[in-house]
Each structure stands twice: as structure tokens, then as C-alpha cells.
């Protein structure tokens, strides 16, 4: 009976979750995978294009080229280029062949992309500091309590199994209802399921979901605005990148040796046009994904909590959320951090056994597993008894060796005394 009790201890200790020495739930993901993907693409792509634009500027050295007369020195030609580059945003000094076009958009194109990258990162920054700390503490509490619910169920099965082992085999009528009597145990194991009550309170809360929806709406608005700007810039750059620039101002106003205007061309417009097209296509593909993130919390998914229906007193039907509330968002984040939830893995195994075992209760199957191991151990010689027998056998062998050595020493002593007597008689 002691060996059977020890075997049951080993079975349930394997399933019982151990308390880790390091902090639990260290790598919680506080951002959904689809939101993280949108942020990385929406912010990372403009930064990549900006780096390419500045690399092109460094390799070429200048962003504008103006046709100066041959009588101008290289310093005068450089002055014309610098003056016309600085006057791009001034309409009075410029005359374009295609009319009054805002040519300053070409000059500030990389900086506008940088502005969009900053605006698209603001929702992620707001979520990190305004919502993530509260979400992290709630998720740690919920996941820890779910593990405790699982541990209490295992302890209940263990206590029920110990009770059956102490009582011994019952009459046939009792063994038929063993599946029902197994859970007729003390309510102290399942009293006050605080995680269930806490999750139900999230159905009436909407603080977290409002922050989430606000972040997604801001992201959608900025991406849509960026698409409009990039479309306009692409159409603008395809019209003309050449203009006439006049440098007659100040002391040069009345200088007759200086032409009235210079023909100038923006060199980087072709590169900017290609970069704007790439960014526009990616953002256009990103718009449906951003719209999808707005409706992600509306999915009524309780797959993670549904596994816990195996345990007593845990009813997942009460966790069906309707509309947008915090509970729908917590379900998504539990699914996102499912790798950190150890009890889910164990219960998933038991659920698979239940589905393939013709409706067998997983906890009952677990106790049967303990009985099978108990029978196997009973069929063998216990290790403690075997070692004890080996110790006794070794002690007996030591005593036999001592007896043999003492007999040998006595015989040798007799032989020595006889030899001395013979020598003295001679």
C-alpha cells in the first residue's frame, strides 16, 4: 500500500506545476502580432526610404543643377545652385513650365516621410505607456490564477485517489459510479474561483478597449493621409522637375551682366518618385490590415479558456463577450501569450485524450494512469526491500569471511606450536 501511495505521488507530481525560481511570465507580449507587424512596416519603411534618399544625396553631393553662363566662375555657379535650392519654397523667385507647382515638396520629401514615421509610432508609444503596464499586471494575475485552478484540480484528483486507496475496493455498485463519486470531494479545493469572477467583471469594462480602438483609428487616419500625400506627390513629380530661377535681388537687382533667369533641374526627383511609389503601394496594401485590426476584438474567441472547461466549476460559457469590451481584448492577449501558460499545455493534452478516448473524463483517466503504474511497481521487488536484502546478504558474507579467517588463523597457530615442540624434543 505504501508503494501504491508513492506511485500516485509521482504521477500527480509530474502534472502539478512547480513554482519557478525565476520570475514567472517574464516575456509577456503586450502587443498583438498583427498590430506589431503594422507598426514595424508603417514606421520602418519610411525610415528605410529616408536612409536611401540621404545616401543618394551623399553620393551625388547636390540636389539641384542650374545652367549658368560660361562666363561664370565655379564659385558663381555654386552660388546660383545654392540660391535656387534655397528659393525652391519661394514662389516669387520661381517660374515653372507647368504652372505654379509646389516644388518645395521635392525639397522636403524625406522630412515629410520622417514626419509620417513619427506620427505612426505615436499610437504604439501611447499604448506602451498608457495601457501596457495595467495590461501586464492583469495578464500576470489571470495566468497565475489559471495555473492555480489547474493545480487545485490536480490536488483534488490526488485527494480523491488517496481516499480510494485508503478505503480499499468497494462493492460493484460503487465502482460503477466511480466517475461521479470521484469529484464528490471537499469544496475547499474549488472555493472562490477568483479568476472566473475577475474575468466576468471585464465584460462591463471598456477602458482598455477604448485605448486600443483609439490607437488603431489614429494609425488608420495617418496611413490614409500618407496615401493621399504620396499619390499627390507621385502625380506632381511626373509633371515637371524643371523651373526657372531668378537671382536678381539685393545688390544684384540692377546688374546687367546677370541673366534674368536660370534654367534649373531637381536631380533627386526621379529617385523620390520611385521611393514615393514604393511607399504608396505598401501603405495601400497596409490599409486593409489596419481596418482588420479594428475588428479583431469583435471576434468572440474563447479558445484558451474553453480548455479549462475540463476542470470542475469553471464555466467558459459565461465568458462569451458581446461587442467591444475589455474581455474580448483579454481573450486575444491570452491567446497571444499562450506559450507562457503552462497549465494550458497540460490541459490540451488531457483534452486530446478525452476527444480520442470516447468521452472518458481526463481526470478519471489520470487516476487510472496512476493505478496502472501502481500495479507495475507492485509486480516488481521494491527497491528499498531489495537494497535491504542486499545489505543483509553482504553482512552475512562479511561474517562468513571473518569466521573463515579466524579458523585459518587458529589452524596456523596449532601448526606453529607443534613445530616448536618437535624442535625442542630433537
Swiss-Prot record:
Q: Cite the ranges annotated as topological domain Cytoplasmic.
A: 1-40, 128-216, 299-426
Q: Where in the cell is it found?
A: Cell membrane; Endoplasmic reticulum membrane
Residues bearing carbohydrate: 254
Q: List residues modified as S-nitrosocysteine.
A: 40, 346
What GO biological process term is on the record, naming one? Answer: response to ATP
Give the residue spans that cross the bilayer. Answer: 41-61, 107-127, 217-237, 278-298
**Claim: Membrane is one of the keywords in the record:** yes
Post-translationally, this protein is described as follows, namely:
S-nitrosylation inhibits channel currents and ATP release.
One Gene Ontology cellular component term attached to this UniProt record is:
endoplasmic reticulum membrane
Name the PROSITE patterns on file. PANNEXIN (PS51013)
Q: Name the tissues where it is expressed.
A: Expressed in the eye, thyroid, prostate, kidney and liver. Abundantly expressed in the CNS, including hippocampus, olfactory bulb, cortex, cerebellum and white matter.
The protein's predominant localisation is membrane
* Bilayer topology: Multi-pass membrane protein
Q: Site (Cleavage): which residue positions?
A: 375-378
Region (Disordered) residue ranges read 407-426
Domain of life, source organism: Eukaryota
Q: Which UniProt keywords apply?
A: Calcium, Calcium channel, Calcium transport, Cell membrane, Disulfide bond, Endoplasmic reticulum, Glycoprotein, Ion channel, Ion transport, Membrane, Phosphoprotein, S-nitrosylation, Transmembrane, Transmembrane helix, Transport
**Is Phosphoprotein tagged as a keyword?**
yes
Homology family: Belongs to the pannexin family.
So what does this one do?
A: Ion channel involved in a variety of physiological functions such as blood pressure regulation, apoptotic cell clearance and oogenesis. Forms anion-selective channels with relatively low conductance and an order of permeabilities: nitrate>iodide>chlroride>>aspartate=glutamate=gluconate. Can release ATP upon activation through phosphorylation or cleavage at C-terminus. May play a role as a Ca(2+)-leak channel to regulate ER Ca(2+) homeostasis.
The name on file for this protein is Pannexin-1
The gene for this chain is Panx1
Amino acid at each position: 500500500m505504501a508503494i501504491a501511495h508513492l506511485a500516485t505521488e509521482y504521477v500527480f507530481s509530474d502534472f502539478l506545476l512547480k513554482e519557478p525560481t525565476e520570475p514567472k511570465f517574464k516575456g509577456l507580449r503586450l502587443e498583438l502580432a498583427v498590430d506589431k507587424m503594422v507598426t514595424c512596416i508603417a514606421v520602418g519603411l519610411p525610415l528605410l526610404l529616408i536612409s536611401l534618399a540621404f545616401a543618394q544625396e551623399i553620393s551625388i553631393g547636390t540636389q539641384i543643377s542650374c545652367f549658368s553662363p560660361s562666363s561664370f566662375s565655379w564659385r558663381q555657379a555654386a552660388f546660383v545652385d545654392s540660391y535656387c535650392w534655397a528659393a525652391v519654397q519661394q514662389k516669387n523667385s520661381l517660374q515653372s513650365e507647368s504652372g505654379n507647382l509646389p516644388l518645395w515638396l521635392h525639397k522636403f520629401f524625406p522630412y515629410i516621410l520622417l514626419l509620417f514615421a513619427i506620427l505612426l509610432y505615436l499610437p504604439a508609444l501611447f499604448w506602451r505607456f498608457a495601457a501596457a503596464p495595467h495590461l501586464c499586471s492583469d495578464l500576470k494575475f489571470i495566468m497565475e490564477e489559471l495555473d492555480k485552478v489547474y493545480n487545485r484540480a490536480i490536488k483534488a484528483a490526488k485527494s480523491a485517489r488517496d481516499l480510494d486507496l485508503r478505503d480499499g475496493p468497494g462493492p460493484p455498485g460503487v465502482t460503477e459510479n466511480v466517475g461521479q463519486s470521484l469529484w464528490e470531494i471537499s469544496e475547499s479545493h474549488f472555493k472562490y474561483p477568483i479568476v472566473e469572477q475577475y474575468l466576468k467583471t471585464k465584460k462591463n469594462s471598456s477602458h482598455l478597449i477604448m485605448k486600443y480602438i483609439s490607437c488603431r483609428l489614429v494609425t488608420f487616419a495617418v496611413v490614409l493621409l500618407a496615401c493621399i500625400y504620396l499619390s499627390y506627390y507621385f502625380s506632381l513629380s511626373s509633371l515637371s522637375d524643371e523651373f526657372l530661377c531668378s537671382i536678381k535681388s539685393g545688390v544684384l537687382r540692377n546688374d546687367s551682366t546677370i541673366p534674368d533667369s536660370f534654367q534649373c533641374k531637381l536631380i533627386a526627383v526621379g529617385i523620390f518618385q520611385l521611393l514615393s511609389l514604393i511607399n504608396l503601394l505598401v501603405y495601400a496594401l497596409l490599409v486593409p490590415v489596419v481596418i482588420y485590426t479594428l475588428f479583431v476584438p469583435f471576434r468572440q474567441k474563447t479558445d484558451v479558456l474553453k480548455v479549462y472547461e475540463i476542470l470542475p466549476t469553471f464555466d467558459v460559457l459565461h465568458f462569451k463577450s458581446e461587442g467591444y469590451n475589455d474581455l474580448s481584448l483579454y481573450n486575444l492577449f491570452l491567446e497571444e501569450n499562450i506559450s507562457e501558460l503552462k497549465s494550458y499545455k497540460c490541459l490540451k493534452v488531457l483534452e486530446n485524450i478525452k476527444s480520442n478516448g470516447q468521452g472518458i473524463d481526463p481526470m478519471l483517466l489520470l487516476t487510472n494512469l496512476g493505478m496502472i503504474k501502481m500495479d507495475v511497481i507492485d509486480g516488481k521487488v521494491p527497491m528499498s526491500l531489495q537494497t535491504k536484502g542486499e545489505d543483509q546478504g553482504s553482512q552475512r558474507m562479511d561474517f562468513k569471511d571473518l569466521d573463515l579467517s579466524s579458523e585459518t588463523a587458529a589452524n596456523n597457530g596449532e601448526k606453529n606450536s607443534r613445530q616448536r615442540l618437535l624442535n625442542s624434543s630433537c
